[in-house]
């Protein structure tokens, strides 16, 4: 499968499939991608929650930024550092994660849920 077909297939997949891909790919690559700007990490405030947006690779973060958030730049974070930062956010119930958003739909998960899934996958492969 060439990269364009792979990209399109994942970009157009349902949110749950993209979430599962995010977990396995981020752990395999040992990194996650977020968007950042001069004020810090890009967030979306929806329904009283602050959502951090994350992707499994730069190409998807770039595509989202190009389409919806031109002032934000993709930044890579080591998976272990990301997990540590998630642990620091555990008590803040207003923070959630939008995992692999594409503009059409998104998988929203609590910090605890995301950290649990990433930790489980890390334990499985390490």
Where in this protein do the model-derived segments appear?
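Conserved NAD+-utilizing ADP-ribose enzyme module
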Residues: 1-126
């Amino acid at each position: 499968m060439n990269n364009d077909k792979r990209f399109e297939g994942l970009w157009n997949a349902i949110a749950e499939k993209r979430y599962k891909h995010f977990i396995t790919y981020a752990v395999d690559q040992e990194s996650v991608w977020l968007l950042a700007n001069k004020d810090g990490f890009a967030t979306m405030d929806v329904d009283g929650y602050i959502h951090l947006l994350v992707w499994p690779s730069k190409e998807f973060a770039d595509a989202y930024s190009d389409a919806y958030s031109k002032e934000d730049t993709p930044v890579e974070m080591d998976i272990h550092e990301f997990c540590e930062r998630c642990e620091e956010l555990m008590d803040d119930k207003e923070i959630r994660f939008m995992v692999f958003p594409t503009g059409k739909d998104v998988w929203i998960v609590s910090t605890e849920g995301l950290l649990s899934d990433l930790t489980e996958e890390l334990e499985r492969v390490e």
